[in-house]
Amino acid sequence: MGAAKNIWALANAEDAANDAEQIPYSSFVVDTSLPLPLMIPRIIELCKDLFKNWGELDDSLFSVERVSGGITNLLLKVSVKEDTNKEVSVTVRLYGPNTEYVINREREILAIKYLSAAGFGAKLLGGFGNGMVQSFINARTLEPSDMREPKIAAQIARELGKFHKVDIPGSKEPQLWVDILKFYEKASTLTFEEPDKQKLFETISFEELHKEIIELREFTGLLNAPVVFAHNDLLSGNFMLNDEEEKLYLIDFEYGSYNYRGFDIGNHFNEYAGYDCDYSLYPSKEEQYHFIKHYLQPDKPDEVSIAEVESVFVETDAYKLASHLYWAIWAIIQARMSPIEFEYLGYFFLRYNEYKKQKPLTFSLVTSHLSASL
């Protein structure tokens, strides 16, 4: 909790230096293991503590409902009838337990304000011991099948192109291999209390896994891929769409960092498969070209040269392999640390097996591309 407070203090110190509005912080910690009915009074108490104009309101004026149940965080919608009887809604995001092993919260909080200022995601309204409060976005969360709709795919590509142009202060060094190796060091030392999980865990060859990481790092380095501020978690659940306004929102930047452009796009294409990892749903070359054209030239996608599109296509195909390694190793840690009911170890094998299946095809594609460009 002290670390969380220090992060918010650092963020507010930067605001103070720029005469910007301070973001309120509460030392409250909400027990995420509680069932929702028992959690609601604590959430109301938290909101009253954070936002002083709500402090004297009766609890009956608050309503709390779950709006998302991902495999990392818990999102709650809190609606309040203020003195004017006008209803105001905010989103309370509760971090999953032990997520500090896979998420750099300092990096997230210091970036989120710049992204919000650039028009991305929800506005940051406050922070607390194990989460944050943001403005509520009136839109629906996308499903994996939505992302392949040509119109929505083009919207996502345009939005991502703008996102990658945002300048976030600090080191511009790509974090992909730093994060993967950090995950690897943690994952390789774990033990499980459940015999079945431990037995399955022991079938993982960490020596082989480490060799794959180093080989892929060296191989993708041959591409000299551009480095951008990347979202790094472009699954369907991190896009929201207001159908009436046809407005798309990119949300949740907790994995965001400077990274290789191809990783962000390749990771997004992998997410067409959903949590079930049905990779028959991976976008076709035609669908990828459609996306890449709108990413590179949102106003004139048909004027992008085939050479430009092919270059990004190959870069994306290479880094989709890194996406498989990243989330495969992440899943091992989550299998040990997360209280959420999800077959994380099974997910590791689904991602790692797909990595091994795609590796020879991708290596051949990239090698041919590099040879042709000499």
UniProtKB/Swiss-Prot annotation:
Pathway where it operates: Phospholipid metabolism; phosphatidylethanolamine biosynthesis; phosphatidylethanolamine from ethanolamine: step 1/3
Annotated keywords: ATP-binding, Kinase, Lipid biosynthesis, Lipid metabolism, Nucleotide-binding, Phospholipid biosynthesis, Phospholipid metabolism, Transferase
Function of the molecule: Involved in phospholipid biosynthesis. Catalyzes the first step in phosphatidylethanolamine biosynthesis.
UniProt catalytic activity: ethanolamine + ATP = phosphoethanolamine + ADP + H(+)
GO biological process, one term: phosphatidylethanolamine biosynthetic process
GO molecular function terms attached to this record: ATP binding; ethanolamine kinase activity
Family statement drawn from the similarity comment of this UniProt entry: Belongs to the choline/ethanolamine kinase family.
Protein name as it appears in the record: Probable ethanolamine kinase
Species for this entry: Arabidopsis thaliana
Pfam families (alphabetical): Choline_kinase
Superkingdom field: Eukaryota
Signal peptide start and end residues: none
Any single GO CC term annotated in Swiss-Prot or TrEMBL for this entry: plasma membrane
E.C. no: 2.7.1.82
Top EC category: transferase
Binding-site residues for ATP, renumbered to this chain: 93, 252
